[in-house]
């Protein structure tokens, strides 16, 4: 199959020094290509001719496709004098590099954070799965006891289940101060990057006729103005505040203490268990990752009349990543799909779906499309089994839906 080894994808899913170098080398080339394509006056004129020649009965989708393309040419500065076009291109190059560095600093700050623990009592409430992973990480780094890292499964487990309030507070501060001037590692402070991104976005927006970046951003969205967005958010907050305050009061009454941010997830889990006798950890046994993926593909097969077949011979970027050939009921291969489900060092947090090979080549010929699903679930235990929470299952199905 067409490999998903492009540097932009691997920078998020399997970053190391070599892949990051490849990413940094490819980024300015791709940025230059994208900007020059968007500023190509001949291409814009071709779209304008298509727009002028649309028949009266052209579909709304067709009209919108052309209108959006023409809009995007304008947003890229196609109408500007040459010296301003050049400045816009320079800004796009700078933004691409700074935003990449912003992401890398968050990743590096997250990977560098670790908390050694020698007393098992400090880890009360954490599952066997989390403890085994922490013990293995300590052993890997030549330490005794446990080493808790800031990968999302560990962070979520501590914030939701750790009885040790001080441990939860430590993790909370570690998470929210990553790559900041208040974080544990000043070398990855992103404050300057934020200032530079804001300034460059503002300048780019001004160049193409907007007062600020907020207006520029909304040119491709449903909201008509920044003021409309702020009004919507304030209205939403006014309707949500009473309910939120009532729920917070319930947590205070339930716990008998002043509720801090690092207490909320923990107390919500305790309250849910008391009121409804439901435990997210207890539900894990029903959701082995392999069974969830199998069920996902079975549902897709019923809905779309396709089949997914794992191909272990395909070389991937990590042993956790698997490749599936997608075939129709007649056995014809119609695409491919990668899954990369488990958290690890060098991998961006979160969950996302994207394509790495499009359906058509630039010359218009068809090729097999390939997509990928990336998540950050708890890695398999010593038995090779990863048990998901119900929220994890929802995440898998949500992302696959894209």
Where do the PLM segments sit?
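Short histidine-centered catalytic/ligand-binding loop motif
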Residues: 160, 170, 281-288, 386
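Aromatic/His-enriched, Gly/Pro-containing loop or helix-boundary segments
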Residues: 58, 69-74, 185-186, 355-367, ...
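Active-site recognition of the HExxH zinc-binding catalytic motif
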Residues: 391-402
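Alpha-helix N-cap/helix-initiation motif
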Residues: 3, 7, 186, 190, ...
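Short small-residue beta-strand/loop micro-motif enriched in glycine and branched aliphatics
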Residues: 157-158, 225-226, 381-385
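Active-site-proximal, well-structured secondary-structure segments within enzyme catalytic domains
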Residues: 65, 94-97, 104, 108-149, ...
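His/Asp/Glu-rich acidic catalytic environments and adjacent acidic regulatory segments
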Residues: 21-224, 239, 319-321
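Single conserved hydrophobic/aromatic residue that forms the stacking wall/gate
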Residues: 1-14, 18
């Amino acid at each position: 199959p067409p490999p998903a080894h492009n540097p932009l994808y691997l920078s998020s899913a399997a970053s190391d020094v070599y892949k990051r170098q490849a990413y940094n080398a490819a980024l300015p080339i791709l940025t230059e290509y994208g900007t020059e394509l968007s500023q190509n006056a001949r291409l814009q004129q071709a779209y304008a001719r298509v727009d002028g020649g649309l028949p009266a009965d052209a579909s709304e989708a067709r009209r919108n496709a052309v209108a959006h393309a023409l809009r995007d040419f304008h947003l890229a500065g196609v109408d500007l004098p040459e010296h301003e076009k050049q400045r816009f291109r320079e800004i796009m190059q700078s933004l691409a590099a700074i935003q990449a560095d912003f992401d890398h600093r968050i990743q590096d700050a997250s990977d560098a954070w670790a908390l050694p623990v020698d007393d098992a009592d400090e880890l009360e409430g954490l599952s066997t799965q989390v403890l085994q992973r922490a013990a293995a990480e300590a052993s890997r780094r030549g330490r005794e006891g446990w080493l808790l890292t800031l990968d999302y499964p560990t962070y979520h487990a501590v914030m939701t289940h750790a009885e040790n309030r001080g441990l939860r507070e430590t993790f909370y501060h570690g998470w929210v101060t990553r790559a900041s001037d208040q974080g544990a590692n000043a070398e990855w402070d992103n404050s300057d990057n934020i200032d530079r991104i804001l300034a460059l976005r503002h300048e780019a927006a001004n160049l193409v006729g907007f007062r600020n970046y907020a207006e520029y951003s909304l040119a491709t969205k449903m909201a008509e103005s920044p003021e409309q967005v702020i009004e919507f958010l304030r209205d939403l907050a006014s309707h949500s505040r009473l309910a939120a305050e009532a729920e917070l009061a319930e947590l205070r009454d339930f716990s008998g203490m002043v509720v801090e941010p690092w207490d909320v997830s923990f107390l919500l889990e305790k309250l849910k268990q008391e009121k409804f006798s439901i435990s997210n950890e207890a539900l894990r046994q029903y959701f082995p990752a392999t069974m969830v993926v199998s069920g996902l593909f079975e549902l897709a097969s019923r809905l779309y009349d396709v089949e997914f077949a794992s191909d272990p011979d395909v070389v991937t970027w990590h042993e956790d990543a698997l490749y599936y050939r997608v075939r129709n009921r007649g056995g014809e291969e119609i695409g491919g799909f990668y899954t990369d489900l488990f958290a690890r060092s060098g991998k961006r947090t979160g969950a996302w779906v994207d394509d790495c090979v499009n359906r058509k080549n630039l010359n218009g010929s068809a090729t097999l499309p390939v997509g990928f699903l990336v998540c950050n679930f708890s890695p398999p235990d010593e038995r090779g089994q990863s048990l998901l929470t119900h929220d994890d299952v929802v995440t898998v199905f949500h992302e696959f839906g894209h």
